[in-house]
Amino acid sequence: MNEDLQSATCSATSTPATASVGAESVGGAASVAVVQTEPQQTTKVEPHNVVGVGTETVSDTRRKRSTRFTMVKAIAIICVVLSHAGISGWLSHFVFIFHVPIFFLCAGYFFHTKYLNDAHSFVMHRVKGLYWPFVRWSVFFLVLHNLLFTCGILSEQPQFGNATMGVLHPYNWTQWSQHLWSIVFNMSGYNDFLCGAFWFFRALFVASLLFLVLFKILRKNSRFAQDKQAGWALLGCGVLLTLWKTTCGLHVTGLAQGGYRELLGLSFMAAGFLLRQYKVMERLTWKVAVPCAVLLLVASFLFPSSMAFNGKTLDFVSIFLPAIAAFIAIAYGCQFIDRRDTFVKRSLVHIGDNTLYIFAFHIVAFKVVSALKVACYGLPWEAVGGHPTVLNPASNVLWVILYLIAGVGLPLLWMAGYRRVHVYVKKGEARGVELLLTAGDYLLKGLGIALKGLLAGLVFLVLNFRKLSVAALKGIGRFFLGIYRGIKQTIKDIMSASSPEDE
């Protein structure tokens, strides 16, 4: 069910209400990172007469929802789609620096310390918003895996694979089962082509839990009683753990892809939390935003980086500050868009509210444009299986734009259609659940009867064990006695038949 963000009813000085990471929505999850109602000016509604009688008021005070960070997330997810749409060169370096880190920064920025005393709610939010969508959608594509080769959506031919000519292959039962286990127990094993971005679910899930655990541990020490002190300690832990991993080439045991993304995500969450504690966004001016934008541009030219799973120490150093700078600069720009109710603002807010679906399904949506590209260039249908797009010929600006529109638009279109029929779907689900419960009830009754019969038999055996044992022994004795007598009689008959006297 949707967990709609509610406007806060407290004053601007109160603690803002938050919606945690991946709050559950239609289909199982809402947007990727947390969205929060940011403090705004209190708007007083003047009293007015109702039909000319009395002085009743509609409301005394009202606070509007700030959509600035929703638009920040929208820009980030658009850049995620753009990075997979076939771009290259400087633009690719530019978007890879900040597009995914922004979601970790948002998660840390809106972390509420109330969860230190309510860890269960925090964990359940993450399970419902990150783990469950990951498992459900990964298993869905796993079920369709072999069929996708028949349809040509996936191909075993190297020229129709990824940029390194890597390809996937159909699974046998053992391979399929192993992938299922990896999905459920390790948040890995997903389809590397159609679900290639699903590592984000695991990274944010693990980073969020690690952030909470470390925060609770630090709070037990009086030195970290203040949020700022704890935030700096969390940042130090994240940075040191990441550097330890990269400098020594370590791998976090049991964590898919080694854990670099999870530790880097922890560092970004701590940085976002500190930005909130120091009220950087509330005091943000062009004097801060412009240098941040310059740092991002310089980094994209001189030392580009990304959240690749095999990141080195230089990659970590190159991405950390520029990504934070990008978050600040984009948030500064979005506050101007947030001032007026325009088409651009409404579009970005809608995209920002559905980032999880775009993140999960944009590569699948690319296949529609890939089919169009295959038709235009007269390529074999198997070329649709190229990951993430048709790689040869390379995409020009037109194809990049089409991939971008499809990657963002088609998941939104699908969700719009789903929301129109979700009432009927819910009714069908309720009926299905009712039938399952009824069947389960009959099954339990049958099992109960069988269990009662089994217990009655066991009781009878226990109570009559002596009698039954004696009867069984007598029966066995009679059986062997009969065999003995039969053998004896047979021998007698043979001896009688061969008697010399008769001869």
Question: Which role does the model predict for each range below?
Answer:
Residues N2-V50:
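Intrinsically disordered, low-complexity cytosolic terminal tails
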Residues K44-E503:
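Alpha-helical transmembrane segments and their immediate juxtamembrane cytosolic regions
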